[in-house]
UniProtKB/Swiss-Prot annotation:
The active site is at residue 466. GO terms for molecular function: chitin binding; endochitinase activity. The gene is LysM11. Pfam families: Glyco_hydro_18, LysM. Chitin binds at residues 467, 701. GO terms for biological process: chitin catabolic process; polysaccharide catabolic process. Disruption phenotype: Leads to enhanced fungal virulence, with faster decaying on infected fruits. Transmembrane segments: none annotated. This is Probable chitinase LysM11. It catalyses: Random endo-hydrolysis of N-acetyl-beta-D-glucosaminide (1->4)-beta-linkages in chitin and chitodextrins. Keywords: Carbohydrate metabolism, Chitin degradation, Chitin-binding, Glycosidase, Hydrolase, Polysaccharide degradation, Virulence. In plants, chitin acts as a microbe-associated molecular pattern (MAMP) that is recognized by lysin motif (LysM)-containing plant cell surface-localized pattern recognition receptors (PRRs) that activate a plethora of downstream immune responses.
Amino acid sequence: MKWSNVNSNDSEVVKQSLVVSKSCGASQQTSDITVQVGPAGTIKATKDSSTAIQNLASYMTNAASCGTTILLSKAGDSVAALYAGADVYQSDVGPYLLNFKKQFKAGSQIIQSCDSSSKRDNTIGVYIVNSLDDLEGIDRALQTWSKGSCLDSDGHDLIQSKTTMLGVSEVSKRSDISSSLEGFLAPRAEDNFDKYNTGTDLCKNLKVKQRVCCSAGSLPDIIPKKQSDGTCGTYTIQTNDNCAEIAAHFGVTQDDIYDLNEDTWGWAGCGTNDLKADQVICLSEGNTPMPSPLSNAVCGPQMPDEFCTESPARTKAPGAFQSGKNGCISNCGTYIVNNDDAPENFYHVAYFEVFNLKRECLNMDVNEISDTSLTHVHFAFAGLTADFDVSFDNDEYKAQFEKFVKNDASYKRILSFGGWAESTSASTFQRYRDAVKSGNREKFAKNIKAFFEKYDGLDGIDFDWEYPGATDIPGVPAGSDSDDDNYLGFLKLMKSTIGDKSLSIALPASYWYLKTFPIAKMSDYVSYFIYMTYDLHGQWDYNNAYADVGCPSGDCLRSHVNKTETINSLAMITKAGVPASKIFVGVSSYGRSFGMVDPTCTGPMCKYGGAFDVSTAEAGSCTNTSGYISNAELNLIMQGVDSGASNYKGRTWYDEDSASDVMIYGTKGEITTWVAYMSDDTKEARIDWIKGLNFGGVTDWAIDLQELNLGVDPDSDEAQDLDLPALPTGCSSANWPDNLEDLRNKIDKIDLGCRAQAVVWVLIKILPDILDNYQSAADNYDEYFKYYAEWVRNGIDDSLPLFMWSDGQNYMDCKWSSTSDGSGDAACTEMHVPEGQPGQGEVSITYTVRDEDGFYKALQADYGIEKDWIVWKDIYADPENSLTCPPCPNLTKDCKPCTGHGVTYHNWPVKAADDDIDVPNLKDIIDTAVPNITTLQDVILGSFIEMRIGAMDASDEDVATALSMPVFMIADTTEQMKNITKIGKEQEKADDEAKVSFILDIVSIVLMIIPFAGEAVDAIGGVANVARAAYVVGEAGNAALSVYDIVKNPSSAPFAILGLVMGADASVVGKASKTTFTKAAAFRNALTEDTLSSFSKEFRANDAIVQDIVKACKRA
């Protein structure tokens, strides 16, 4: 476009020309797009980040550049990066960004419109970091977008939007071919192209490597054909291949590729990073191909040279093979087999970890097992003595077992032996190797038989020897080649010994450990196998090149309950000759967790840290093991996140690829940990799937990890002592209100035993908003204190005469003279002289402080005035002309007596100069209280968790009573802070009543938060110094002084309660003391009605709701 051809006097023409120039000469079209928005709360300084986005939007709105745009904008500490692809109408990016103001203000880090399968460069991406220290994240995001890929969007929200795209004017990999060909081909060539290629919309859908005609005729049939042996037509993936280009090159569609490869080895789809170099895929109908061999594979279809390869001898005789070959082996393919018939019954096993009692919390008594869906419960674990008899670690575990076999349960009661710890401990591992040997197994079997006779309620035994024949368990000598045969012989003898009692063993889902088990033969003697299809991945994968597909270093984030890998494991065991009906497939009630190297990277190629035996994952508060965390703990962490608890961060999502749930979390202010697990819904879906495959049942590790329990036998004396029978075994918070008013109105719908917990739940829900409002209000208080200090100083002159005409005279001597009534010299209380009377004549009074210590103490106590705040001067007062001749501050030539009937006061106290009066800045107390309020938030959440898991050694009612008082105090303070009107310059003319009210409000606020401020109060002279302003400007009985009466004693209820609960370390689950909350509740309960009346109406109303609820609970 040339401006010489534009009529610059025509504004519409100029405007249209500018629009065309901004589109770089290309056509424009409005496109519907899907925008992926990252989770809220990732970015902290949302005000700064929003400003950075506004700057980017402003620049882009006024930009007229062509091609790809990459911009960075910094505001405060936040840095925002923008990527806008070459096919995006750049000037429309600004308004597009402003559509997401709400998401940016909420703290979203990533917003991207991105399609990695598109051939156009139409990505719009924004990536924000909290500081310059995090620029690596921006670099990674920009590189990803510039390569045509997209950032991981797991857990992102999807929002439909619109923006303007361009038709580009040059051919490129990502260009729109239909518009690019115009002008690219010479007119004659373009005519020929259309002549030889007549397909509808061909240009619009052209792909790289797609074949077209350059002459008359038709294209050859290039679709691969089925091979002569029935194998499909294959293609070997090359580096940087993608499905779109492969489909175009071979004349098929991407949908065809998906359909043809549903059963192909290693097929993961067409997504980013899904195709692997050297992977073999199908491009036609036919049998699935053999995968490419791996030189280091020792089994399976990728083992070099042989899998399902026929190699008959030259004679072709049956069973005769070429030298060194095995022929077509029996386990060809990757399908689950031996599952044609459904079992007679589908069973549901759960393990009970008796060692849960060693945990500091999340305890469960064996009599708390109440799941009616269970058909078997395995009591884990018993051990072996040196002479092959049954043992328990301690008397407590044995007592639990004896209750287990005596209870009247609907499920089968099975005792499990071994486990990982006993199988690998230096003191016990050899016992399992020896017990199954031919010389010992009979003795062991007899001992087991005697054990059954002693405990006739026992229905079976289960052996969890981990693992016979294993050679790589750290700290354990390599197993013997005879372990497998010994184990088989032992099982054969054990089955004949125990008769119709149940016999089962646990099997690993790993080929390396399973290969030593003669499982096909074992299946003749066991009732079922416990197949541990959990722990498929864990910290032990670290630095293992064979642990994670596509992850040579073994340190990639992978799910330990991955469904695809579970399928492979099930194929492995069924192909080994075990009928599906005898296999109980593992599901889990815990997660395997990893410390993330990059908390923003959550996909299967992202890395975790640590070492083979060192996990950097955040440990659960009860299981207390990095890398392993219970579902119950994960649920509690998300409760903390959902309730806005300080330092709790996290989010969850369902991962389709692994068919498992994923959570990232951190409880110390930052997300640090990735964990894969099964939620209840996921577990139910997995169980239904397993049942549909005709397996015999499922086995769940472990029932005590699922949810919170009391950890006490409901029928025991201990339960009676703790008054536990009245408590329900679980309090669901799903429908609890999140404010006190609704809680009071709906309290009848909540079980009595759960109501105190519901109170604490409400405290958790309301405290974040209280804290936010407190901090917001506190931001304006620097301005407020300027007026506060000024008005306190101005009140001194009003208060001094009141003191001098009352208690002040008790500490002074007077010398006086009067023209009408003589003179004298005595204590001021005995002075007789006319003052303030018409016609009195001239009066002169000189004051001398007799008891200086008593004078200043009384002045401070009664009126809050410090010694340094006054000076002693001579002043004059005229009673006859007070309206026109006010009292003179001193006798100077500028202030002469107005009449002959005044009074001269010598050595009279007056306000010192403003600069000499240091009014404490109470803002310091307001600011200092914030960290302690935040800590209180953590304490309440920690206490709630203890209540939920049954680790709180105190009554729920005492906990609710103790925690509510400090919350209501800070809530009351916040409301007062919000209600103080911002003081502007016009308020300098406020009347005296308004000024006094303002000062008293501020003093009341600060006094109420003093229990939260700690040493900051001492820095300004203590509580009395805070209250001083109320004495200077107020009067006895004002509201501020009533609050002062509450908090002036360090042992009063607010101080005592806060000190107890803040010192309880309740933010660490299991650490709270029963006496802590009992004592704190006692301080609240000891408050009299008179004392309570000193608190605000709102405080008393909230407190009354809590008291009514907890008293009803105690009466029940």
